[in-house]
Amino acid sequence: MFPGSVIRKLSHSEEVFAQYEVFTSMTIQLRGVIDVDALSDAFDALLETHPVLASHLEQSSDGGWNLVADDLLHSGICVIDGTAATNGSPSGNAELRLDQSVSLLHLQLILREGGAELTLYLHHCMADGHHGAVLVDELFSRYTDAVTTGDPGPITPQPTPLSMEAVLAQRGIRKQGLSGAERFMSVMYAYEIPATETPAVLAHPGLPQAVPVTRLWLSKQQTSDLMAFGREHRLSLNAVVAAAILLTEWQLRNTPHVPIPYVYPVDLRFVLAPPVAPTEATNLLGAASYLAEIGPNTDIVDLASDIVATLRADLANGVIQQSGLHFGTAFEGTPPGLPPLVFCTDATSFPTMRTPPGLEIEDIKGQFYCSISVPLDLYSCAVYAGQLIIEHHGHIAEPGKSLEAIRSLLCTVPSEYGWIME
């Protein structure tokens, strides 16, 4: 086999995802009839529009990673007939192998009675959540056009997305002296942290494993009430959810005197000038930090307001914009001496995806796949079709415990504050 052409070298911020072979996936439950040929045409059009998605990764002689073009066509959709299931399992191999040395993008369709399950797997070095959501939306839009008109739409090949480092350099943003993590130094080794049992996680190089995930959905009414509550108190949904997660973690940890370090990504597309299109960059994220000092009388509105105030201050002084330039390519979890970190993504608002007549989206689920021996523990949030989704990813002893407590808090807060739907 002859080596392919190198498209470009992965940047520092992208290499961490290559080192741990990190893929993200979005699984969509569909009800109705699926036109497999039209979906195949839509997927081909997506790849022609974003040709870099058909590439793969190769390690370079200096230990880094290269993005390499393939001479062969992408393998296309993997279709599994789940209607011939035995013992509840679809016929064929439903476990798609994820191999970054072969492909960075996969699409799997499992046909079921009355519908299907569609999963798009995307290597994290090529796309963050915002970028990935736009690709899924484009796939469904092209599929709808292919079904209704016979044509998946115009194709204009897009350039290879830029790394975070390249985008920041274009805008004159350079590494400063502070990363934002300095606010955690005051609690480093300042408390006696109770020992917790760490689950063993076996890494299998070349075979990324699914990270367990549990999740909750709020109803449209519950989500609407929560958003109205936030507007009343001039708070974003992200801030209210973050405060609820931190209050829940404080309660479950049973260490009331120990502050909680909180870290969350900030989509810099909304911050930089000129703005950046969703698929113009790979992982265009800054890291925001907050030290939650919670007590028995801590109020969710006060906590959320302080999170927002801290974020605004860090954006104003430029810390968040350059924060990603400070971090290495090794993931080691919470640093020694620091209380366990809480990490949560911002609530991405997914567009209401187009579907042809007779096909409906019933459910959406995200998942991570990676080869890493450090146990993961993180929250992710999204809003789809007016409903808030919170997922808890990781190797956690009681995965549903925190989510149920978060649900209870988020659903009771509007009424406890006397907010009533008119």
Curated annotation (Swiss-Prot):
<keyword id="KW-0443">Lipid metabolism</keyword>
<dbReference type="InterPro" id="IPR023213">
    <property type="entry name" value="CAT-like_dom_sf"/>
</dbReference>
<dbReference type="GO" id="GO:0016740">
    <property type="term" value="F:transferase activity"/>
</dbReference>
<dbReference type="GO" id="GO:0008374">
    <property type="term" value="F:O-acyltransferase activity"/>
</dbReference>
<feature type="modified residue" description="N-acetylmethionine">
    <location>
        <position position="1"/>
    </location>
</feature>
<keyword id="KW-0444">Lipid biosynthesis</keyword>
<dbReference type="GO" id="GO:0016747">
    <property type="term" value="F:acyltransferase activity, transferring groups other than amino-acyl groups"/>
</dbReference>
<comment type="subunit">
    <text>Monomer. Interacts directly with the acyl carrier protein (ACP) domain of the mycocerosic acid synthase (mas) protein. Interacts with FhaB.</text>
</comment>
<keyword id="KW-0007">Acetylation</keyword>
<keyword id="KW-0808">Transferase</keyword>
<dbReference type="InterPro" id="IPR031641">
    <property type="entry name" value="PapA_C"/>
</dbReference>
<keyword id="KW-0012">Acyltransferase</keyword>
<dbReference type="GO" id="GO:0071770">
    <property type="term" value="P:DIM/DIP cell wall layer assembly"/>
</dbReference>
<comment type="function">
    <text>Catalyzes diesterification of phthiocerol, phthiodiolone, and phenolphthiocerol with mycocerosic acids, the final step in the phthiocerol, phthiodiolone and phenolphthiocerol dimycocerosate esters (PDIM) synthesis. Can directly transfer the mycocerosate bound to the mycocerosic acid synthase (mas) onto the substrate alcohols. Is also able to catalyze acyl transfer using various nucleophiles as acceptors and several acyl-CoA thioesters as donors in vitro; preference is observed for saturated medium chain alcohols and long chain acyl-CoA thioesters.</text>
</comment>
<dbReference type="GO" id="GO:0008610">
    <property type="term" value="P:lipid biosynthetic process"/>
</dbReference>
<feature type="modified residue" description="Phosphothreonine">
    <location>
        <position position="198"/>
    </location>
</feature>
<feature type="active site" description="Proton acceptor">
    <location>
        <position position="124"/>
    </location>
</feature>
<dbReference type="Pfam" id="PF16911">
    <property type="entry name" value="PapA_C"/>
</dbReference>
<comment type="similarity">
    <text>Belongs to the acyltransferase PapA5 family.</text>
</comment>
<feature type="site" description="Important for mas ACP domain recognition">
    <location>
        <position position="312"/>
    </location>
</feature>
<keyword id="KW-0597">Phosphoprotein</keyword>
<dbReference type="GO" id="GO:0005829">
    <property type="term" value="C:cytosol"/>
</dbReference>
<protein>
    <recommendedName>
        <fullName>Phthiocerol/phthiodiolone dimycocerosyl transferase</fullName>
        <ecNumber>2.3.1.282</ecNumber>
    </recommendedName>
</protein>
<feature type="site" description="Structural role in the organization of the active site">
    <location>
        <position position="128"/>
    </location>
</feature>
